[in-house]
């Protein structure tokens, strides 16, 4: 049955007001939650405005969700993210990984592009996400769907690794056969 997503997720906007020493994370479209993604110091030394993301909660940057930068936090007991991020909890009736796959789907990415607002960058407010429809079968069926999608994702990941290895092999064989094209150790004629 189709339901309104907002009936199954709830905003969580708790700030690190006590300036606890909590790891700072970003959310990327390829790796999900990443510590020190940009390889530099956090823009602000004052992290009291940063939002806490407990284990199992979702977070996304409203101006990056259009490329799939959304994930649920499964790294630490709690982490913090930029104050710009939206953070939300999920109802026990909605399997987190099922929601994750839904939010990364082409259907949702197209819908985000259609409803997001902004002059320079598209921006998706949490209130807009609440209005998205989601097919919500029973929990057991959600878990079965997740198992299938997890297996497919694993196969895709392994195939991508194989392609990378084959690409490396082709490059190394080329170098063995013809040498470095810059140094031209075999004195190939150049036209």
Q: Which residue ranges define each predicted feature?
A:
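A short glycine-rich beta-alpha junction/loop motif
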Residues: 63, 78-84, 117-140
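A short beta-sheet element
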Residues: 51, 55-106
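Non-catalytic DNA-recognition/assembly elements of restriction-modification systems
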Residues: 1-16, 133-146, 158, 162-191
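Sequence-specific dsDNA recognition surfaces
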Residues: 6-55, 191
């Amino acid at each position: 049955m189709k339901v309104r997503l907002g009936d199954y997720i709830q905003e969580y906007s708790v700030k690190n007001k006590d300036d606890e020493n909590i790891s700072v994370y970003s959310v990327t479209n390829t790796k999900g939650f990443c510590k020190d993604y940009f390889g530099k110091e956090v823009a602000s030394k004052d992290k009291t405005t940063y939002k806490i993301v407990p284990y199992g909660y979702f977070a996304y940057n409203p101006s990056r969700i259009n490329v799939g930068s959304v994930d649920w936090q499964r790294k630490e007991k709690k982490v913090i993210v930029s104050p710009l991020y939206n953070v939300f909890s999920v109802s026990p009736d909605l399997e987190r990984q099922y929601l994750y796959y839904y939010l990364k789907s082409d259907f949702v990415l197209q819908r985000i592009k259609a409803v997001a607002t902004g002059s320079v960058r598209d921006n998706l407010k949490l209130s807009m996400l609440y209005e998205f429809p989601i097919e919500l079968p029973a929990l057991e069926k959600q878990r079965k769907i997740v198992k299938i999608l997890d297996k497919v994702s694993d196969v895709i990941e392994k195939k991508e690794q194989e392609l990378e290895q084959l690409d490396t092999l082709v490059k190394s064989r080329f170098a063995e056969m013809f040498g470095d094209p810059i140094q031209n150790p075999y004195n190939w004629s150049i036209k």
